[in-house]
Amino acid sequence: MMLPSPVTSTPFSVKDILNLEQQHQHFHGAHLQADLEHHFHSAPCMLAAAEGTQFSDGGEEDEEDEGEKLSYLNSLAAADGHGDSGLCPQGYVHTVLRDSCSEPKEHEEEPEVVRDRSQKSCQLKKSLETAGDCKAAEESERPKPRSRRKPRVLFSQAQVFELERRFKQQRYLSAPEREHLASSLKLTSTQVKIWFQNRRYKCKRQRQDKSLELGAHAPPPPPRRVAVPVLVRDGKPCVTPSAQAYGAPYSVGASAYSYNSFPAYGYGNSAAAAAAAAAAAAAAAAYSSSYGCAYPAGGGGGGGGTSAATTAMQPACSAAGGGPFVNVSNLGGFGSGGSAQPLHQGTAAGAACAQGTLQGIRAW
């Protein structure tokens, strides 16, 4: 029994299946090649490859290196060609080259995206800054609401005259006085107070300006000289004439009293005093020449001689006396009865007699 033929038994054979697969692969390869050619014509790097130009990845390479690359790619395409008969080695090479050219383009697109984003952020920032500047400029240009000042008070001539007259009389006013003046001038107390303050300040400024003008025109005063006494010169003390004058002892020349003639006193310098002193001296001389004192002689010896001596001590004055001497020759009764010696006026007895004479002159 013969087996039926595979051709007759089945509507298709293995060859038909293989042919269908080959046709499908061929169709798919043709479509892919057309698509690749479309991309090659649009890409500038593929145009350069078709024209036989050199490829460079940022730097120029030798022709030998490019030939080696192309041969390596062709060998890879020949090794893998049995699986895909529709792809020729040239198409595979173009595919690899397209991938190699498209990769840098993708890498180039990434910085562009980053650059675009940075540009957009910068533009946004600039726009915000410009908006802020514009807003600040608008606010600065906008007029600020100014505080409304009170209108300035204008005084009449009569009011100013009265205020000036009162200011000359009294520079500072108390509260009641200010109220009274304000009511008389039909002003407020605050207005009067401010007017007086301004007037005082004006007077102060006028005085300052006047003093400055006088100081500018007037010459400066000469330096003051003060006499300083020199006490030491060249290591030696200096004595001034005034010190010498005051250093001498203070003394007044006066003659001693003379119990005989009683000369004139030397304390007066006037003519009247000199005349009075001369008259007193003449009277004293006349009195001393006409009046004398004498002691009579008395008995002496023993205890009974005391009374006799006492009696003998009484002065005997006579008009024709023998001068200023006192006779005391008979004073033997004193003591143990020794001999007595005559005494001069300078002794104690003579001094007592002279004292009586001086008292009479002073009384005169």
Swiss-Prot record:
Residues 148-207 bind DNA. The keyword Signal does not apply. Pfam families: Homeodomain. Residues 135-144 have a biased composition (Basic and acidic residues). Residues 132-153 are annotated as: Disordered. Keywords: DNA-binding, Homeobox, Nucleus, Transcription, Transcription regulation. GO terms for biological process: CD4-positive, alpha-beta T cell differentiation; cell differentiation; cell fate specification; gland morphogenesis; leukocyte homeostasis; leukocyte migration; lymph node development; macrophage differentiation. SMART domains: HOX. InterPro entries: HD, HD_metazoa, Homeobox_CS, Homeobox_NK-like, Homeodomain-like_sf. GO terms for cellular component: chromatin; nucleus. It is found in: Nucleus. One of its GO terms (molecular function) is DNA-binding transcription factor activity, RNA polymerase II-specific. PROSITE patterns: HOMEOBOX_1 (PS00027), HOMEOBOX_2 (PS50071). Belongs to the NK-2 homeobox family. Transcription factor. This is Homeobox protein Nkx-2.3. It comes from Homo sapiens. The gene is NKX2-3.
